[in-house]
Amino acid sequence: MVKRTHGYRYKSRKLLRKKPRERGLSGLSRLLYEYKPGDRVVIDIDPTFVENAPHRRYQGKVGVVIGTRGRAYVIETYLGDKKKILVVTPEHLKPHQGGS
C-alpha cells in the first residue's frame, strides 16, 4: 500500500470554496483597504489567490495588525494559548466588525 500524502491544502475542499455568486476576483475595495497598526482583522482566505494564502487552520481567526512587510501585513493572532505571527496579504484580510 502507498502512504497517503497530506499536503498544505489537505482537507480544505469545502473550506476553500466560493459560492457561485462569489466566483471570480474580489472587489478592489478589499485589496486597497489600508490597515493601521493596532487594527483588528479577520483572516478570511480567498481561494482565488493560492500562492500567498495562510494555512487553513487560521481561517476565521481574529488578529491584530502589528506592521507591514512589503505590501503584506504582519498579524499577531492566537492559536490556542500560543501567540502566532503571520504575514498575510490584503486579499486574505477583512476588517473586524466586532465590539472590542
UniProtKB/Swiss-Prot annotation:
Gene3D superfamilies xref list: Ribosomal protein L21
Keywords: Ribonucleoprotein, Ribosomal protein
Organism superkingdom: Archaea
Record bears the keyword Cell membrane: no
GO molecular function list: structural constituent of ribosome
Pfam family, one: Ribosomal_L21e
GO CC field: ribonucleoprotein complex; ribosome
Gene Ontology process terms (BP): translation
Annotated region described as Disordered, given as residue ranges: 1-21
The UniProt record lists the keyword Ribosomal protein: yes
Entries under NCBIfam families matching the protein: PRK04306.1
PANTHER family, A to Z: 60S RIBOSOMAL PROTEIN L21 (PTHR20981)
The family this protein is said to belong to: Belongs to the eukaryotic ribosomal protein eL21 family.
Protein name: Large ribosomal subunit protein eL21
Gene label: rpl21e
